[in-house]
Every structure is written in structure tokens, then in C-alpha cells.
């Protein structure tokens, strides 16, 4: 009986995981995640982001949004499979465009034997490496685009329910007054959302 319960529980978790992955790609849901937690989206309305996800094109006929292959397999360095991997070009108030790469992960098990944020560092590095030869090369590293991993924990412990943490690169001025350009080092960010319902995605870090 215990074995039956274990199998039933595992099947239930797998079913939830698959359904959550399908939900993530819905423009209304993904749009709210981007608007709520991506810094580069602060100048763009939710309605416009949803239109970009739905397939809006620029004057040259290029899509602003792409759902990308969620598998990155680097020779001799293993394979990773993201839950939902995409990139989107976000218009800025100054007339420029910022492209970001985004992986949204549904993490049903809060503690799988390691810290999900540590796994996220691996994901971020692979997302950056996958841009080599496309966004940047050895002659122009400045073409590198910012990467995000957003973790959603729908079965977080009650004591963490509603908590949101952001982990990113910070500059520490040890000596002197030289300040490096933010664009030079602000290339990766993780956001951990511990929420027992998806309503958190309507929140915003830009308030």
C-alpha cells in the first residue's frame, strides 16, 4: 500500500509539473512574470508585453519574442533541460531595445538535496555560453545579453509563503572612486518566488 501511495504521489507531482510548464507559456501568465520581475520591463506596459509574446513584429518583420529550445547540450559539459526558456526584446523609454534571456523554473520540491539557487548558477552560465557566436564573440563581449532564472516554488513551506528574493551582481568599491558601468557586469540574476498560489505573478518589483 505504501508503494502505491508513493507512486500515486510521484505521478501527482509529475502531473502538476507538466501542467505548470504549459501554463508558463501562456502570454497572460508569462507577461505578468516579465512585467513583475524583469527590470528591463519597467518601461513597458503589461498589455504591450503580452502583445510581444503573442508574436508582434518590428518594422523589419522580426519577432520581439522567441520561445527557445529548452535543452542546452554542451559537448563534454553535460546537458540541461529548462522548464521554459525564451528571449524577448523589450523597448526602453530612451528608444533603445534590450534583449533578455529568461528561464522560468517550477520547483515542486523545495529542498531536492541541494540549493536550487546553486543549480541556477549553472543554468545562468549555460544561458550566457549559448549566446557565444550569436550575441557576442571574442571580438565583442559587450554584445552579451542579460540572463534571468526565475524560480517558482508552488509548494513552499508555509513559513516562506509569499517571500520573494532577488540574487544579482553588486559592485563593491574597495578603493578609489572609479565606478564600473552597470551594463558591464549586470549580466545575470535569479529570483526566488516562494508562493503557494500563482497570484504572486501580479506583483511588481518596480513599484
Set out the residue ranges of the language-model regions.
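Elongated, amphipathic alpha-helical interaction scaffolds
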Residues: 1-207
Amino acid at each position: 500500500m505504501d508503494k502505491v501511495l508513493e507512486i500515486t504521489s510521484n505521478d501527482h507531482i509529475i502531473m502538476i509539473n507538466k501542467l505548470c510548464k504549459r501554463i508558463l507559456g501562456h502570454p497572460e501568465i508569462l507577461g505578468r512574470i516579465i512585467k513583475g520581475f524583469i527590470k528591463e520591463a519597467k518601461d513597458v506596459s503589461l498589455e504591450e508585453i503580452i502583445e510581444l509574446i503573442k508574436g508582434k513584429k518590428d518594422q523589419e518583420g522580426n519577432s520581439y519574442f522567441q520561445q527557445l529550445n529548452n535543452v542546452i547540450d554542451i559537448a563534454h559539459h553535460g546537458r540541461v533541460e529548462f522548464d521554459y526558456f525564451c528571449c524577448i526584446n523589450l523597448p526602453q523609454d530612451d528608444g533603445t531595445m534590450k534583449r533578455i534571456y529568461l528561464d522560468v523554473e517550477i520547483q515542486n520540491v523545495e529542498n531536492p538535496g541541494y540549493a536550487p539557487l546553486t543549480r541556477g548558477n549553472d543554468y545562468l552560465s549555460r544561458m550566457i555560453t549559448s549566446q557565444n557566436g550569436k550575441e557576442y564573440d571574442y571580438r565583442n563581449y559587450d554584445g552579451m545579453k542579460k540572463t534571468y532564472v526565475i524560480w517558482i516554488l508552488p509548494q513552499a513551506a508555509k513559513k516562506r509563503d509569499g517571500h520573494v528574493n532577488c540574487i544579482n551582481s553588486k559592485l563593491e568599491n574597495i578603493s578609489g572612486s572609479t565606478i564600473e558601468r552597470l551594463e558591464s557586469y549586470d549580466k545575470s540574476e535569479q529570483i526566488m518566488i516562494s508562493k503557494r498560489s500563482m497570484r504572486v505573478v501580479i506583483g511588481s518589483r518596480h513599484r
